[in-house]
Swiss-Prot record:
The protein, known as: Phosphatidylglycerol--prolipoprotein diacylglyceryl transferase
Keywords, comma-separated and alphabetical: Cell inner membrane, Cell membrane, Membrane, Transferase, Transmembrane, Transmembrane helix
Transmembrane stretches, start-end: 10-30, 56-76, 92-112, 120-140, 174-194, 202-222, 237-257
Native organism taxonomy: Bacteria, Pseudomonadati, Pseudomonadota, Gammaproteobacteria, Pseudomonadales
Major subcellular location class: membrane
Annotated pathway: Protein modification; lipoprotein biosynthesis (diacylglyceryl transfer)
Amino acid sequence: MLPYPQIDPVALAIGPLKIHWYGLMYLVGIGGAWLLASRRLNRFDPTWTKEKLSDLVFWLSMGVIVGGRLGYVLFYDLSAYIANPTLIFEVWKGGMSFHGGFIGVMLAALWFGKRNGKSFFQLMDFVAPMVPIGLGAGRIGNFINAELWGKATDVPWAMVFPPFSDPAQLPRHPSQLYQFALEGVALFLILWLFSRKPRPTMAVSGMFALFYGIFRFIVEFVRVPDAQLGYLAWNWLTMGQVLCVPMIIGGLFLIWLAYHRAPAAPVAPTA
């Protein structure tokens, strides 16, 4: 069994102001994505300035935050937030939905693309290889918050999470780290290597949806579902898995469509 590192969820406290690691991980993810997007910018569109890229990152970040929070409210705990709507604003306590954030990003990309002469999938293909940086950083934030841990297990790398998080004090799968490894590291490598060569429009977006859906679906088997939802069917199907099914199907369809439709402008390769 591995010891769980005792990390205060509050990274910095200045009087009543508290800066949480969870929030800092979002900044790390957004900053890392912006840096890598800057590296690809000239190949994506030589006419784009760093200022336009910053605008894109800003609006996509708003899509992640607003969509992620509202997605969690709608998909995972609607009744609690209806009873106490002010909880919606307590983002530092966790409660963000990737699938809600994904919808928020798509809406932001659709709006931004129309204003800047880019199609939806041109922007999504450009952005997709950077998204795993934010996903990985977010999973580290979950780990520091001691939330979203896995089922009890006797594997050698099991961890006992703090009593405030897990009163049962059982050795558990560190499922946040599994997701960091798959959704962060592995997905980044797949997309970065795949996009190094010119690809037809929609192919990179399809690869993102397909592999994120597969990785998340797999980890859900060892991750404890949200207490207010539990398993939806068969004592193993979770809300996360249900939401991943359309991503997997949609990803496969986009990849098929990208390679079978009439030729279109390919996504710019990665440097």
